[in-house]
From Swiss-Prot:
Gene Ontology biological-process annotations: regulation of translational termination
Entry keyword Nucleotide-binding: yes
Lineage of source species: Bacteria, Bacillati, Bacillota, Bacilli, Lactobacillales
Name of this protein: Peptide chain release factor 3
Gene3D superfamilies: P-loop containing nucleotide triphosphate hydrolases, Peptide chain release factor 3, domain III, Translation factors
Length: 523
């Protein structure tokens, strides 16, 4: 055991924030950056009209539309811990990026709108978190507005998601009548709007407010005490072992917009969340985070994070060992040696050169085309390969071509870089070599078209081809004559053949005609 390295690893907290769109995910990210001293003021959703955009929404289209379509990666120091926070897209069309991001974290923070409760995208993302077996912490947001009963919100976690919710604090009122938060662990109340000269926190004795405090004889506070009594009688008690096993979620209430309850949440989160742990490698081995040899995997590639430089960043989750500038690593996919001279991390929108990084850290590598999403990198003689990252089979397809044939170079450069990010997938018509894009949702095409024009000066024509089902075929079984008016024969960017069918009926027709041919949803 390398004790010095392990001490560094144990100070890391690497987590993703997940939610349904508009639940306040980006706002709580901003408030955490504010608490970490990375930014001086948080950009709110309202401020988007004035041009003060959220720090973690860096892409121009995100600023214009007020949505997150990429995963932002940010780091800061807080209470002696190194925080690596990944703000993920809430929009379902970009769930593939979110799923990959969840492979790179040790915990998740689930933000829920207290007026709406658990929404469809939250359910989908929670399912992935559960499959990964990582702990999830719940933040019931928007307490500054009227919402559902807190007892109902906690009960819904078990009813809908099948996870035990344990309240760590409890609201005293909500909306216009919000008075404060009862911190159950520390037996104190955090006041929502303390008067001038008044302490923000009021210590409680045996659950009772001291005489002369704003809570003394307050009917709303008395009602809260009754709810807590009910909760403690019927609910489960906090069990960190269950939390780490993904069987129980600590529940915090607050308002990200007014920065109420966020600090208490972050303080308790850094204490309760796990440090980086072991990772599976080579199919059946466990790699310890304090293993001496450096290793990691690339979970995200992003072009043009700095439009002035037109560069590409490959994001690496460090899994073991220690990164240092100039480190020589092997790219497992090719066996090629790569020297990591230029690595950065992100503090808000600023880039900071990385001199060292350990397990749990997220490092951005300047990429000239060496890396692909899912690549494993390692130093040392022992080959280390991490499990493949999840891939979605597209359900929407569009033919794409440049509007100006004189700008083929810009078109091909933009196409290649954006496809390598993994948000859209590229296919070529088997006969004509036409370009076809595949995506999970329509918004991905809109973002592709927008970025081609604004980042690569290449306007594109996009037309739907009306096919919805993609199925790969073994090249040994392929006969080009199988292509018909009911399907389209294409090849993916690695040259593998597949058929695009208009619908499930067309696929069944193909199976009936060629019963011995095996088609697969993924290669």
């Amino acid at each position: 055991m390398n004790k010095e390295l392990l001490d560094k690893v144990n100070k890391r907290r690497t987590f993703a924030i997940i939610s349904h769109p508009d639940a306040g995910k980006t706002t709580i990210t901003e408030q955490m950056l504010l608490l970490g001293g990375v930014i001086r003021s948080a950009g709110t959703v309202k401020a988007r009209k004035t041009g003060n955009y959220a720090t973690s929404d860096w892409m121009e289209i995100e600023k214009k539309r007020g949505i997150s379509v990429t995963s932002s990666v940010m780091q800061f120091e807080y209470q002696g811990k190194r925080i690596n926070i990944l703000d993920t897209p809430g929009h379902q069309d970009f769930s593939e990026d979110t799923y990959r991001t969840l492979m790179a974290v040790d915990a998740a923070v689930m933000v829920i709108d207290s007026a709406r409760g658990i929404e469809p995208q939250t359910k989908k993302l929670f399912k992935v978190v559960r499959q990964r077996g990582i702990p999830v912490f719940t933040f019931m947001n928007k307490l500054d507005r009227d919402g559902r009963e807190p007892l109902d919100l906690v009960a819904e976690l078990e009813e809908v998601l099948g996870i035990e919710g344990v309240a760590m604090n409890w609201p005293i009122g909500m909306g216009q009548s919000l008075l404060g938060l009862y911190d159950l662990a520390n037996q104190r109340v955090e006041l929502y709007h303390p008067e001038e000269g008044q302490d923000r926190f009021i210590a409680l004795a045996d659950g009772k407010a001291p005489a002369g405090s704003p809570l003394a004889d307050d009917p709303q506070f008395e009602e809260t005490l009754g709810e807590i009594e009910l909760l403690e009688g019927a609910g489960a008690s906090f069990d960190r072992a269950k939390v780490l096993a993904g069987q129980q979620t600590p529940v915090f209430f607050g308002s990200a917009l007014t920065n109420f309850g966020v600090e208490t949440f972050l303080e308790q989160f850094v204490d309760l969340a796990p440090a980086p742990g072991e990772h599976e490698v080579n199919g059946d081995e466990e790699l310890k985070p304090d293993d001496d040899e450096f290793s990691g995997f690339i979970f995200k590639i992003q072009a043009n994070m700095n439009p002035q430089h037109r560069d590409r960043i490959a994001f690496v989750r460090v899994c073991s060992g220690e990164f240092s500038k100039g480190l020589d690593v092997t790219l497992a996919r090719t066996g090629k040696q790569v020297r990591l001279n230029n690595a950065v991390e992100f503090e808000s929108s600023a880039r900071v050169q990385v001199s060292e990084a350990v397990a749990g850290d997220i490092v951005g590598l300047y990429d000239t085309g060496n890396f692909q999403i899912g690549d494993s990198v390692y130093a040392g003689k022992r080959k280390l390969e991490f499990p493949p990252l999840p891939e979605f089979t597209p359900e929407l397809f569009m033919r794409v071509s440049p509007k100006n044939v004189m700008k083929q170079k810009s078109f091909h450069k933009g196409m290649n870089q954006l496809v390598q990010e993994g948000a859209v997938q590229l296919y070529r018509n088997y006969q004509t070599d036409d370009y076809i894009l595949g995506a999970v949702g329509q918004l991905q095409f809109e973002v592709f078209q927008y970025r081609m024009k604004n980042e690569y000066n290449s306007e594109v024509e996009m037309t739907s081809i009306g096919h919805r089902v993609a199925r790969w075929i073994n090249p040994d079984q392929l006969d080009p004559k199988m292509s018909s008016s009911r399907n389209l024969l294409v090849k993916d960017r690695f040259g593998n053949p597949l058929f695009l069918f208009e619908n499930a009926f067309a696929e069944r027709w193909f199976h009936d005609k060629y019963p011995d041919v095996e088609l697969t949803e993924k290669l």
